[in-house]
Amino acid sequence: MTEPLKPRIDFPGTLEQERAEAFKAAQAFSGPQAENFAPAVAEELLSDEGPAEAVVEAALRPKRSLWRKMVTAGLTLFGISVVGQGVQWTMNAWQTQDWVALGGCAAGALIIGAGVGSVATEWRRLWRLRQRAHERDEARDLFHSHATGKGRAFCEKLASQAGIDQSHPALQRWYAAIHETQSDREIVSLYASIVQPVLDSQARREISRSAAESTLMIAVSPLALVDMAFIAWRNLRLINRIARLYGIELGYYSRLRLFRLVLLNMAFAGASELVREVGMDWMSQDLAARLSTRAAQGIGAGLLTARLGIKAMELCRPLPWLNDDKPRLGDFRRELIGQLKETLSKKPQ
């Protein structure tokens, strides 16, 4: 026997239709757009190196504020007024044949000319410092570019700015490794792996030497005032050497911008007794027990000098860091500890 048919069941409402995902239509890029195409890069996570790292980076980075623009505009108007008044005085002195006033106007014109020349020189140096940031952005774009024709000229400009001679072995190896079929990304990557490490190694040596000198000097100096003066002098000298190494000449106002960072470093030179308290994490029990207070302060000042050098190196470097190229503070810390161990081992018991 067959079972009877079940009655129908009526469901309220309408059936849900499957939702098809809407995709954007294909977009064809023209020649210039294809050359400038670069994949989107997600925002990097904030660095967890602490507030001291932020202070160092803020002091090294060139910045423009509204107050600075207002002061610049006021000084410009004042300078124009002074020049106009000077021209009027000169004309009056010439018409009345007042030779004393005319000589004073000539002396004032010489002083104003010297001042304008100095300001122009400082502005050019500040502009060059800001241009280095734009060059890093351009290099970052070239690292993602698959076009050709721009990478070689860009790298040759960087080598010329750094003062690298055409006969330098590293530059000759780079010329031998590149060819016309390579993209800008490949050419700049080869420059970053062959030529740029030559300058980076020199900057690392400068940082290591300055940090070691700061450590040893503070460890043996009995006067806090001498420590502060030595730290200030060594840090300014380190910044100048790193900037000159990468082809940047710092001016007077650039040094003033870094002066508060130097003051911060000097203040830490007097408060680096904390290194003694965390010394067990860095060194063995035996070495931490043999460290004196002055030696611990020297290690703290040396580490802060190394941190300052790393940030100055990052600012003056024309290429962004790749992979693990960025120097780590721990590397300099191990060097300082090794030098301190050697010094303590040579010290008569």
UniProtKB/Swiss-Prot annotation:
A single Gene Ontology CC term: plasma membrane
Compartments in which it is found: Cell inner membrane
Signal peptide extent: none
Transmembrane segments: 70-90, 99-119, 213-233
Keywords: Cell inner membrane, Cell membrane, Membrane, Transmembrane, Transmembrane helix
Topological category with respect to the lipid bilayer: Multi-pass membrane protein
Top-rank lineage group of the source organism: Bacteria
Primary localization: membrane
Protein family per UniProt: Belongs to the UPF0283 family.
HAMAP family hit by this protein: UPF0283 (MF_01085)
Protein name: UPF0283 membrane protein Ent638_2153
